[in-house]
Amino acid sequence: MSYFEHIPAIRYEGPQSDNPLAYHHYDAEKRVLGKTLAEHLRIAVCYWHTFVWPGHDIFGQGAFQRPWQQPGDALERARLKADAAFEFFTKLGTPFYTFHDTDVAPEGDSLREYAANFARMVDYLGERQQASGVRLLWGTANLFSHPRFAAGAATNPNPDVFAWAAAQVCHALDATHRLGGENYVLWGGREGYETLLNTDLKRERDQFARFLSMVVEHKHRIGFKGALLIEPKPQEPTKHQYDYDVATVHGFLVQYGLQNEIRVNIEANHATLAGHSFHHEIANAFALGVFGSVDANRGDPQNGWDTDQFPNSVEELTLAFYEILRHGGFTTGGMNFDAKVRRQSVDPEDLFYGHVGAIDVLALALERAAVLVENDRLDALRRQRYAQWDDAFGQKILSGGYTLQSLAEDALARGVDPRHASGAQERLENIVNQAIYGLR
C-alpha cells in the first residue's frame, strides 16, 4: 500500500523551478568544501512529529486523519506507520531518521509486553532499513509521556519508576545499536521540578548522574560505538529542567565525571526558550568540547513554549553552520528535523512542503557559511583581536609564568596604560551579510 502515491520522488530542479515539490537549492551531490551537501548535512526526519502526532494541542483534539493512525491492532498499525515513514523518507531522499521507542512500537500494558512489541518492531525496522538504504541517526526512549513519569524518570522519588526507565533505555539503546544507529539521545523532559517545596535537588541530581553512569556502562558493555547525547532544554514540561542549556549540561557532566562520555544534541527552539541564540549554543558546545548533533527547527520568539516549527531563516542557520564548518563538521551527528507541520496543515502534501522548504534553507545556509569559512575574514579579525595573547607576554601569563602579585608588580613597574581597541562589530556584521546575500 502506498500512502503518498500521488506525490513524486523529490528531485533537485534548481532555483528557477516553481515546482513546490522539488528542491530548489538542495543538490545532494553538489560539493562544498570537499564534501557533498548530503555528507555535510546528514539530514534526518523524526518519527514523532511526522508520523505519530495526531494534530492535537492542549485546547483541541487531533486534527489529522492519517491512514496509518486509524483504529485497529496496535502492532499492525505500528507496521503500517513504519511503511508510511519509509515511503516518506525514500521519496524525500533523506538518508537518516530518528525515533523514540514508543513512536515505533505500542507500549502495551506491562513492561514485558512493551519489550516484546518493541523487539518485533525493531526487526521490522531493520527490514525496512535494509530495503530502503535509510539509516538510523539516533534512537531514544520516551521517558516523559506516560503518567508514571509525572515526577521524572531518573529523578523520580520512586525507585521502581527509575527501574522501569532503566529497562526502557536498556532496550532502546540495544535497539539503536542493532539498527546501526550513530548516536543515542537522552532528553530529560521530566528530569526537573515543578516546585522546590517537595524537591531534594541534590538527591535528584545524584540519581540522574547514577542513571547516566549506568547508560555509559551499558554502552561500553554492548560495544555501541556511537555517541551518547543529552538534549538541553530549560523548561517544558517541567518548570525547571536539570539539562537547562549547554553550559549547565557541561557543568553537570564535569561534576559527575561524565564529560568524556556524553555530548549534547542542540535544538534551536530549546536555545530560544533558554534565552540564547542557536549560534550561542552551538559555539558554546564546541568551546566546551561537547558538540554532538543538532535538532533543526525554530521557535516563535513571541511565544514562551516549544512550537517546533520548520527552520526558515537562512540568516540564523548560516551562523550555526559557520561554527559547525569551522570546527570540522559533523562526525556522528546530523541535522534532525524535530519539526512539525501546523495543526491546520492537514494534507499529506504539507508534510513534504515543510521538509522540502527546510532542506532548501539548510542547503542555502551551509553554502553561505562555507563562503565565510573560505574567505577567512571573520576568523582573521578574531585572530587579530586576540593577537597580543600569542606574544611572549600573553603566553607567559597563560603558562603560569606570573603569580597574581608578580604580575601586579610588573604592571606597576612598566606603567601599563592600555587603550581600548574597537570590537568592529558593525564591520563583522557587514561581512556576514555580504556572504549571505551574495554581495561579496
From Swiss-Prot:
Signal peptide: none annotated. Its main location: cytoplasm. The keyword Ion transport does not apply. GO terms for molecular function: magnesium ion binding; xylose isomerase activity. GO terms for cellular component: cytoplasm. InterPro entries: Xyl_isomerase-like_sf, Xylose_isom_bac, Xylose_isomerase. Transmembrane segments: none annotated. Keywords: Carbohydrate metabolism, Cytoplasm, Isomerase, Magnesium, Metal-binding, Xylose metabolism. The active site is at H100, D103. Mg(2+) 1 binds at E231, E267, D295, D338. It catalyses: alpha-D-xylose = alpha-D-xylulofuranose. Its EC number is 5.3.1.5. Its cofactor is Mg(2+). It comes from the Bacteria. One of its GO terms (biological process) is D-xylose metabolic process. The keyword Isomerase applies. Mg(2+) 2 binds at E267, H270, D306, D308. Binds 2 magnesium ions per subunit. SUPFAM superfamilies: Xylose isomerase-like. Homotetramer. Belongs to the xylose isomerase family. This is Xylose isomerase. It comes from Burkholderia ambifaria (strain MC40-6). The gene is xylA.
